[in-house]
Amino acid sequence: MSDLHKAFAKSKLAKLPPEAPLLSESSSMNHPAESSHDEDSSSVSSTGTVIPSPSRQLFARASQGSSDSSSLSWSDFFAKELFLTRETDTLRIIHHVYLTPPTDSGPLFVMHHGAGSSGLSFATCAEEIRKILPKAGILSLDARDHGRTSVQRTDGGAAELDLSLETLNQDLVYVARKTQAEMGWEELPDLVLVGHSLGGAVITDVAKKGELGNKVLAYAVLDVVEGSAMDALQSMEKYLSTRPSRFPSLTSGVEWHTRSRTIRNRASARVSVPSLLYKEETPSDPAKPWVWRTNLSATKPFWEDWFIGLSRKFLEARGGKLLLLAGTDRLDKELMIGQMQGKYQLQVLPEAGHFIQEDMPAKTAQILVDFYKRNDRSALVLPPKVADMRASAAMQKGAGAGASFSALHGGSSAGHLHKP
């Protein structure tokens, strides 16, 4: 699993002396006038006329203090949250979704996070997308057994953990269709599927199976490929044993993520990390009552299922394809060949860590918006078909011949027969 493999490497950095400075994108994003880096100027200029939201003021305080790890609210980044109830013969599932609806026929970016994360992993990126493309909508879900999505048996017992790729596929399709019904949309907007790590495997599977029909314009996979993900399975359990299992507070959880360089953008960590933890009612260690919502060790039976065949499906599915990586070393052979054949768009942000959308939200947003625009069918002006051009030319030629014939015969279009 790519995210855990990356995090394992980062866990070694956590043991080093004081942390290096966090990525500067958040400060340049929040204080454009103070930025002197040309590499950020394009994203800053694209948002220069947007009125700052309340979250921008909160970010400003964090930048000035440089160590503020207090939590930020989801409502600073999304318009609403939905709780979508789904019942089967044995289960009652309440899917939790963060949503900002599209306007003026704008696209809907459907985001799926990685294992152990939540829908708020895309919070800062979602806000940046809206700055660049105000008509765009964002739907970012909590996968089952993640965030605030819950699964219970109808008889009140504990539900068996099911994070198979097929189940996650069906969950995403259900959330998209149910959101359409809840919002009263006659049809789904044009969709751009975006998945990080495990989420990349899920959205690729949905695109390959055509579950959402031709509404899927394109799909983007963030920092996961089959080869490196499968290789990382060997070190996954070791990584899980090295990270803290408990925290004294939410603030300390945010601090651990930034100091370990798991998330390199403090502003994003402040909104995403609190959703990863919950406070035990009767903690085994009262000094550290905050624990992980998702037991990643328990997901081991599904690890290989998530990523086997990912590269093939990514290349074969219909729609525009984007692979956004933190390093080209992640490409496997199948994807390298596909890239040389021009089958998909490849973007690399080497300055980011595994959580690209959190580390570099403005740059990730710009890449995603540009990707959408390249695949926007409504913006295409197709040339006329050759057959239509020939038919039009023939009609014009025929009209010209008719006019000449009429002139030669006294202007009478009906014609008259004269006896000799």
Swiss-Prot record:
Reaction(s) the record says it catalyses: [phosphatase 2A protein]-C-terminal L-leucine methyl ester + H2O = [phosphatase 2A protein]-C-terminal L-leucine + methanol + H(+)
An MF annotation (GO) of this entry: protein C-terminal methylesterase activity
Low complexity bias locations: 18-28, 42-51
Known EC number: 3.1.1.89
UniProt keyword Hydrolase present: yes
Entry superkingdom: Eukaryota
Keywords, alphabetical: Hydrolase, Serine esterase
Region of interest (Disordered), residue spans: 18-51
Location of the active site: 197, 223, 354
Stored InterPro entries: AB_hydrolase_1 (IPR000073), AB_hydrolase_fold (IPR029058), PPase_methylesterase_euk (IPR016812)
Enzyme class per UniProt: hydrolase
Job of this protein: Demethylates proteins that have been reversibly carboxymethylated. Demethylates the phosphatase PP2A catalytic subunit.
Family the UniProt entry places it in: Belongs to the AB hydrolase superfamily.
Protein name as it appears in the record: Protein phosphatase methylesterase 1
Lineage: Eukaryota, Fungi, Dikarya, Ascomycota, Pezizomycotina
Gene behind this protein: ppe1
